[in-house]
Structures are given as structure tokens and as C-alpha cells.
Amino acid sequence: AQFEARPVLETLIDGSLPAFTPHEVVKGGARLLELQGACPFRAAVELRLGGVELEHPAAGIAATERGKLAHAVLQAFWDKAREQSVLLAMTADQRVANVRTHVRSVLAPLRATADAVGTRLLDLEERWLEARVLELLQQDAERAPFTVEFVEEPRVIDVGGVQTRIVLDRVDRLADGTFAVIDYKTGASARPAAWMGERPELPQLPLYVRAIGQEQVSAVAFGIVCTGSTEYRGFARDGEVFPQLKPFDATSAPFTDYASWGDLLQAWNRRL
């Protein structure tokens, strides 16, 4: 009788998550902070429970794949060139040939398994990648002198007692010995305003500044690789170190809450 009287459904409340193990390097990197700031529940589901969002069907190359391809081409170029002077020494034709070689090399594994339609899409992607990378390299050619210190550099960083692994897209050493930290984006929507506020919407670059050491960083930028919008967007300590970026000025937005460039970087570190 007792068995028959049992409830049809039983409720079990378990609000715990898998515990961190000692010295565990938590997956997620900058996305860990991005999700935690926007929605802690989603951060827990995606990064602790392994939940994944369903992919949305799209014509052509998916946005995430396009981003990886652009990163790979730029990495290949700067792995070999390293110095702005090498870029400046190239003729226009040499620059095109160099970039085309890297683009074709990056796309080769995809071409090996593509059908006729896929091959045509990759032809279009090849032209798009080549044009956009050349546009960003032209931006680099117009900058003050620099040397590329790191490309796709892996680091493990401690944030609030949690260790996570990040990859710095690119770090340039400038003429005065300080660093410019660059994060590539293949969408036009990324704005430096996303670094500001108590909960930065896009914390990657503040996190990269922390990894490098804020006292050594004099410029922070998105490298936008996008049709009609390929450019560098970000902030610099002054107008000399990285002329394409907005120089720090405590009397104008968005810097009015900060007494100095160092004060801004310290605020980012504190918020992380």
C-alpha cells in the first residue's frame, strides 16, 4: 500500500555544480568573464556543465569559421614578417602575392573535402580574405614603427582565484618599448565602449592587458576585419604611439572618470 501511494514524480533539488579541482585551469578564457558578467547561469551551463548552443544554418562560411580563417592568415603573415619594416619594404604586388599565398594555404584543408558548391564558396571566401587582410595591413603600414612580439600567444592567467587559459591574438612592441595589444574581430559591431563600465561586455582586451602587465601597455585595439569597416579601433596613451586610436584625454568622453592612462588600466584590472 505504501508503494502504491508513492508520488508519481519525485523532485530532487541539486543546486551544486562540479567542483573545481586544485590547480584546475578552467576552460573558457575571456568568454568565462564575458558570460559571467552578462548571465552567470549561462556561464555555468556552458562552461561547467558543457552545454552548447545549437548552430544556426547559414549560407556560405559560418561567422565563427571566418574568424578562425582571418586569424590564421594574419598569424601566418606576421609569424614570418615580424617587423613593420618588412611590410613597408614590399611592393604592392609583393604584398598581394604574399597574402594570397597565406590565404590559399589556410583554405587548402577545406578545399580538400569541398564539393562543387563548397569550392565555389571557398573561391569567394579567398577573395574576401585576401582583400580584408590587405586592408588591415595597409593600416599597419600607416602606423608608427613597431615589431610584432607575439601572435596567437597562449597564457594561463589568474582572475579572482580562478585560473583560465587565454590566447593573445597579437602584441606589438612599439618604438618606446611599450606594447600595443590587439584583438581581431571579423564583425563590424565591436566597439571600445564594450571595455568600459563595471561589467565590461567584451573583457578580452582588459584581460590581455592584465596578462602582459598594465605598466607596459600603451595601446589597446580591436583589429576589425570586415567589409567596409576594416580598421583599428581602440584607445592609446597618447596620439603618437598608435595614431589610428583615440588618445587618452581625461577631459573628454569616455575618459572623464580617470585621472590618467594608468588609472584607466588599473580600473580594468580591478573590475576583472
Regions found by a protein language model. Give the residues of each.
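Structural signature of nuclease core domains in nucleic-acid processing machines
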Residues: 1-272
